[in-house]
Amino acid sequence: MISKRRFSLPRLDITGMWVFSLGVWFHIVARLVYSKPWMAFFLAELIAAILVLFGAYQVLDAWIARVSREEREALEARQQAMMEGQQEGGHVSH
């Protein structure tokens, strides 16, 4: 019987990504420091650049989501006010 559930890794937040990357980095650096110190330094710079870009992407993504939610709420409030104004204007009392 074949399972219909696909295997997927959990999505890491930026803190989890930092911890994971530092663990991988320390593991690799432990092997490279004595044999190729320049490669260990290059790897540190590469991982730092990737983490900064990934973190900046997540920060921008959260900011864009917040701004668009606020704009949507403001638009809904304006539409609601316009509908209420039209309903009040349509009712004429004698």
From Swiss-Prot:
Q: How does it sit in the membrane?
A: Multi-pass membrane protein
What keywords were assigned to this record?
A: Cell inner membrane, Cell membrane, Conjugation, Membrane, Plasmid, Transmembrane, Transmembrane helix
Does this entry carry the keyword Transmembrane? Answer: yes
Q: Name one Pfam family in it.
A: TraQ
Q: Where does this protein reside within or beyond the cell?
A: Cell inner membrane
Signal peptide position in this chain?
none
Cellular component GO terms, alphabetical: plasma membrane
- Segments spanning the bilayer are 14-34, 37-57
Explain the purpose of this protein.
Required for efficient expression of pilin. Functions as a transient chaperone for propilin, preventing it from being prematurely degraded, and also promotes propilin translocation, positioning it in the membrane for processing to mature pilin.
Assembly and partners are described as: Interacts with pilin.
Task: Report what the protein is called.
Answer: Protein TraQ
Species name: Escherichia coli (strain K12)
Organism ancestry: Bacteria, Pseudomonadati, Pseudomonadota, Gammaproteobacteria, Enterobacterales
